[in-house]
Amino acid sequence: MQLLTIGKNQAGQRLDKFLKKALPNAGTGFLYKMLRKKNITLNGKKAEGKEILAQGDEVKCFFSEETYASLSGAGAAEDTSDYRKAYRSLKDISVLYEDENILLLNKPAGVLTQKAKPEDLSLNEWLIGHLLAAAAIKETDLATFHPSVCNRLDRNTSGIVLCGKTLAGSQALSRIIKDRSVKKYYQTVCKGKILQESTLEGYLYKDERTNTVQVFPDMAEAPEDASFIKTIYTPSAVAGEYTLLTVELVTGKTHQIRAHLASTGHPLLGDTKYGDNKLNRRMQSEYSLHHQLLHAGRVCFPEEAEGPLAKVSGQTFDAPLPHKFAEILQALNLTPDSAC
């Protein structure tokens, strides 16, 4: 008999989902048969598989050692070298907040949030490497749950990324992202003078082939599969022909802020996809800026009295501006005290 005690990383998922991860070489039909015959029990009782697991639950498998080893793939532990390599090699990543369920990471520009190719090292690998190095998780925990980033930033956008340490934490973060109860604010510098707050609405279409997007003012002009987008921006400072903006990302679509502002004639400084090429060349020459100035600087959590997000209920977290961003603001005289 094998006893599997549910830890905080596994809690919150259905029993059948857990069994498929714990026994990856077992077929779905076989697992349900074992549940019906009570060869697999939950807390000493017969189970159907749809039960939601809680921390401390006991799953017993009445198999021979040989059968269990074959079904679980024992001896074929996951290769964690990429996680450890990412943790050693990816620089300037900092932890803004961490508890038993979630982390908030500050990602520098130039680091992928998730892999684009199998050989890539991303923030996702760094996260698991960090947790392994801190002994917050064990290698064996990865058999049933992988901690993961829950929102994505473009490679060359810096700032706050929400991450789930446990399944319950990941599910809660995904929920508040989906229902938009978590508020996300960005800082950027755009071309042109913007003197008042504005709300932009439109429809965004992504060309998967070129990984670019196009913004349309209304659905009548947009392709059928275009997505509704909403962006709210407020000028924080204006100097010369540049504006420092605080942008609330109401909907979170690919390249939304970059494309939406560019569509109004206010492209982001340094944006090579949607920006002003002449201006970008000047920024490269004068400030060695080779990417868009866009920073996910603030996250505001909704009020939640209980559950995995209770410790961050109603809290606001800020990520400091990258050095290059702050340097350019000073050079352009774009301080929050500048007249708007």
Protein language model annotation of sequence segments:
Residues M1-C340:
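RNA pseudouridine synthases
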